[in-house]
Amino acid sequence: SSDLNLDYAGNERNYIFNPYQLVSSRGLYYLVGNHDNHDDMSTLRVDRIGNIKLLDIRRKPLREIQGYHNQNTFDVDRYMKEHIYMFGGESVTVVFEAKRSIVNQILDWFDGNVTFLNETPQKVECRVHVNREAFKYWALQYMQSVKVLSPASLVFDVREAIRDGLSQYV
């Protein structure tokens, strides 16, 4: 299928998209698949897709997508657990520290995909395998209660996002 979208100048742009699964998240529908000129998985909001044309070419095999080299079928349950927001891109193992007061929220977001490690009366250390970009925004959403411990590159990105956001207010 082809996804009609607008670039920054307002011009139409077209994509060749290899679809693998239709999913629903937070009241919206998304098509999970691969932009033909990229090697990773991404998502398109269905309500923003226009001018669809079915092409007479075979879909790219799942095994050719980054992170899916050993898979013949798309595991939608795993994908949804790792992609708490509908961002495409890589999933990574994240370790973070959280106030115990938000354990229920952690379970709401990551149930079945979270391991609780070191626990104290005030804090708990958690490990999740999750979409990197989505977790950055999740950590920002809960920044008063959460501290990312690893990977170091994500710690840096969250710190920079907080610094950039703070500069809007001071």
Sequence positions of predicted segments:
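Core beta-strand-centered patch of the WYL/Sm-like small regulatory domain
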Residues: S2-V95
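Polybasic (Lys/Arg-rich)
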Residues: T73-V170
